[in-house]
Amino acid sequence: MSNAGKSLVTAGLCRVFNQDGYKVAPFKSQNMALNSFITAEGAEMGRAQVVQAEAADIEPSVLMNPILLKPTSDSGSQVIVNGEAIGTMKAGEYYAMKHTLRPEVQKAFDTLASKFDIVCIEGAGSPAEINIKKDDFVNMGMAKMAKAPVLLVADIDRGGVFASIYGTLMLLEDDEREMVKGVIINKFRGDVEILRPGLKMIEDKTGVPIVGVLPMLKVDIEDEDSLSERISGRSEVKLIDIAVVRIPRMSNYTDFNVFELIPGVSLRYVTSVRELGQPDMIIIPGTKNTTGDLKWLRQSGMEAAILKHANSGTVVFGVCGGYQMLGKQISDPYGEEDGTGKANVTPGMGLLDIETTFIEKKRTIQMAGKFGQVQGIFSALSGLPLYGYEIHSGVTEFPEEKALTSISPIHDNGEIMAEGSQNTEGKLNVYGTYVHGVFDGDGIAVKIVEALLAKKGKKMDDIQTINFAEYKRQQYDILADSIRENLDMKKIYEILEAGV
């Protein structure tokens, strides 16, 4: 069911199966998300399956998510197949050609299944979306292709869970209903004994067993639904206040999660000048539509506020599309972003001495390197190692002496190249990079916070270097513990063994 927590349940099951000694991999034939990742082979895939692969303790592969749709507008998306963009399409265009992608999905799944003991397949939305059931290869259509038994995940937190379970099952075809071997009720608060009568009644009415009731779990694992939860929970302003500008088509917001782990730091997502307030650092994140979101910054008054902050000494940091916005201008010779097909030039914010030109081929690559000679408040970053990945269609020109980092591709022994930029005159407080994950390296986020504290004449003696990877492993184990405690794993293994 849509927004029921399928991604986290899948990650939890992957972790349990891995702990039990099985080779397990996640799979989602089609994902729609702005958060994406670049594999070791340079292929682009959805981050939800990256999280699930991490839970399974394996390297992410584009086989786990052969089709990714990245929205570029309210009615169109960039279509990525097997890690490469094949074009931008309106919804009608995509559904008209969707049937041609079924062989790609089948091939990806079969290849993955041949390498692993168990493949955990996540559906998308609800299996009862009868209006788009034709040519389905994501939900029950995918289950048929894989000959896989199905567990239905239902969210009780929003209310009406029993009607939702019953209605979903009744809208399935008879042969599809027979494939559903169990129901998981997710996000429960309170005493499960109160549910017992309802559980028995729904089992009697549908003939499908309830295999467990998962509680509302406080676990810090990135999830497709977690951004709305982060934003709706208004962060109190702490000793260090970091404001991420929530542009309309923001992507890869997970770049900043590491700051939430540091004591005394508030990470806020803001959409207006009023919400922006007086932060210590402003981050402009990546976006699927750089020029469109830059225009939004202008129309909303946010650009003027950011410029005022930068001129008064507040740190401004741009990542990917946010980095492009900080420059002098953005040229789109093919009119790709605005959909006109006509060449256009958009003035940038003018905070960095860079100019960006969009090209047709997207750069997708994992990379490693180090910070160069960093000027100003973040000088302590100089020489620190960094790693991450790039996903962008722009080529950015800048004076090499103003470079922020030096990087090279991890897997093809490419040449070391200057990357990113910084202002080297005036306040020395504006920085930009294409590298997603730039803050995740050991000690980088802590150095940034220490510098922001020093600017205020303060220090935090008990700050510890954060091992982000180890922290995430701990969270996956907490999730697995909850799965074991609240689901009937014996029954789930029996379902796996019996198949369909």
Question: Where are the model-predicted features located?
Answer:
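Conserved phosphate-handling catalytic cores of large alpha/beta enzymes
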Residues: D223-S226, Q329-V345, I354-A368
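Catalytic nucleophile serine of serine hydrolases
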Residues: C320
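Conserved catalytic-site region of short-chain dehydrogenase/reductase
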Residues: M325
